């Protein structure tokens, strides 16, 4: 089910993200992320003491898997927004809307706002965080998940693959990502930033699964290398290194740590004398 509304300012804006979530490759990428990350994401969300029938906002909703799960588990209403909702599927009590969170936080107040792998892509993240907090109802929860560590190879198939791995990592994470405005330091700063924004009961934890060559997380890396091929080559990575990197990711002998994803969450205070 896809009932999509479009905010005028978003439709007129030119998207400048490195990856296109609404494309065919984007759909494969989003499905892989859902497979790898959703179980842990939902374990964090399930532990929150939400009110009955909560109002929720899912920022950068991707394919909508988390938004649909929130609606199903809480019986609440979920607004699922994305800059490119081409692969965003809604559902019962899930409204899909094209919207750029850099422009504003739509609607509210919310009992839950969740954003996974969103803020690290936004150079305006420091300005967006207080707006998200302001959009929470008293007692509402903000949950953020972002990448803090890059993939780390444990066992590689062939001699010489370590050099290929390192050259790819340099091009992708030292050049292409930062040029696109990505911050890999943000995840380690979220806890303190949430406290600074006035949230209470702030907690954080990290999640990092092991990748095996050819599995879903490895295919996710291959997909990203295809979407980012142009910028990677312009950053100095050779076509041969790119080809070999994809072979490594498909080789069942590979063992590597996936991205480390840090989740941080906190609650907007309830004014004295008021109940959440």
Where are these regions (language model features)?
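Class I SAM-dependent methyltransferase Rossmann-like catalytic core
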Residues: 13-38
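C-terminal helical/coil "lid" or tail adjacent to the Rossmann-like core of SAM-dependent
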Residues: 25-26, 167, 202-256
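Conserved alpha-helix/loop element of class I SAM-dependent methyltransferases that forms part
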Residues: 35-52
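Class I SAM-dependent methyltransferase SAM/SAH-binding core
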Residues: 55-57, 61-104
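A short acidic, Gly/Pro-enriched loop at the edge of an enzyme's catalytic core
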Residues: 103-113
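A short SAM/SAH-binding and catalytic strip from SAM-dependent methyltransferases
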Residues: 111-126
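A short glycine-rich, Lys/Arg-flanked "PGG" loop and its adjoining helix->strand segment in the class I
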Residues: 126-141
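Conserved catalytic/acceptor-binding region of the Class I
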Residues: 143-215
